[in-house]
């Protein structure tokens, strides 16, 4: 049974930290194919891979994916999926889930959760978070933190430690890391990418701040399951390969 949302996977070849990572293999299957398979398990109405790279497109077609060739000038994955929406026949209220192309073990339940979350709110965007489990994670600028209202809407996203524990600098209770999985209404996605970057976004290098800056809400639910590591470096790939061996006893 399919659910009433669509998944688009932005698939960029020229990653700054690990070019070609989506074509690397985990037990004989490329990263991008594993992401695609996990997205299918969420039972969306469609799964589309958006890429500007011929080899990624060819591989995706070989394993049966629908592929849309996009511009090579996009600065973000959000811009890339917006091009797919603009080219397609999506209705304004269709739910579009942006699944990153470097998450080979993304849990289908999280994809379903973020899509369902959007249907429970007037906010045009939804995303997820997870409790921070150490001071090291809290103070890591590569881990994006989020603070929320009592009804689960984002107050702010930052690379800094937020909220700041004034009386105990070693505390990390009530802190959450952002999970980079988004659901958008199709019409809002197209509107969002038409806006110029805002000052906060440029300072933090976090494009979701453009939404808050512009006066719109982002719903942020705590994930129903802990997310697994994405692949940003060669070291991450080695860990992912070992995770597969350990989990499936290959």
UniProtKB/Swiss-Prot annotation:
Source organism superkingdom: Bacteria
Enzyme's top EC category: transferase
Pathway participation: Nucleotide-sugar biosynthesis; CMP-3-deoxy-D-manno-octulosonate biosynthesis; CMP-3-deoxy-D-manno-octulosonate from 3-deoxy-D-manno-octulosonate and CTP: step 1/1; Bacterial outer membrane biogenesis; lipopolysaccharide biosynthesis
UniProt keyword annotations, A-Z: Cytoplasm, Lipopolysaccharide biosynthesis, Nucleotidyltransferase, Transferase
Reaction it catalyzes: 3-deoxy-alpha-D-manno-oct-2-ulosonate + CTP = CMP-3-deoxy-beta-D-manno-octulosonate + diphosphate
Enzyme Commission number(s) from the entry: 2.7.7.38
One GO term (biological process): lipopolysaccharide biosynthetic process
Molecular functions per Gene Ontology: 3-deoxy-manno-octulosonate cytidylyltransferase activity
Cellular component aspect of the GO annotation: cytosol
Protein family: Belongs to the KdsB family.
Name of protein: 3-deoxy-manno-octulosonate cytidylyltransferase
Organism: Legionella pneumophila (strain Lens)
Highest classification ranks of the organism: Bacteria, Pseudomonadati, Pseudomonadota, Gammaproteobacteria, Legionellales
């Amino acid at each position: 049974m399919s659910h009433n949302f669509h998944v688009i996977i932005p698939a960029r070849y020229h990653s700054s930290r690990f070019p070609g990572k989506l074509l690397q293999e985990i037990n004989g299957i490329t990263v991008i194919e594993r992401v695609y398979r996990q997205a299918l398990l969420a039972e969306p109405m469609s799964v589309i891979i958006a890429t500007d790279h011929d080899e990624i497109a060819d591989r995706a077609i070989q394993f049966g994916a629908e592929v849309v060739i996009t511009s090579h000038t996009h600065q973000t994955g959000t811009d890339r999926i917006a091009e797919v929406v603009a080219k397609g026949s999506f209705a304004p209220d269709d739910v579009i889930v942006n699944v990153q192309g470097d998450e080979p073990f993304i849990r289908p339940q999280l994809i379903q959760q973020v899509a369902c979350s959007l249907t429970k709110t007037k906010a045009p965007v939804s995303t997820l978070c997870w409790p921070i489990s150490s001071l090291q994670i809290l103070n890591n600028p590569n881990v994006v933190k989020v603070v929320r209202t009592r009804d689960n809407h984002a107050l702010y996203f930052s690379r800094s430690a937020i909220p700041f524990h004034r009386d105990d600098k070693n505390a990390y209770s009530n802190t959450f890391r952002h999970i980079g999985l988004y659901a958008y209404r199709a019409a809002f996605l197209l509107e969002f990418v038409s806006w110029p970057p805002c000052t906060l976004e440029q300072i933090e290098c976090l494009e979701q701040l453009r939404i808050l800056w512009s006066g719109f809400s982002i719903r942020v639910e705590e994930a129903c399951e802990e997310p697994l590591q994405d692949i940003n470096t060669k070291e991450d790939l080695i860990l992912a390969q070992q995770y597969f061996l350990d989990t499936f006893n290959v």
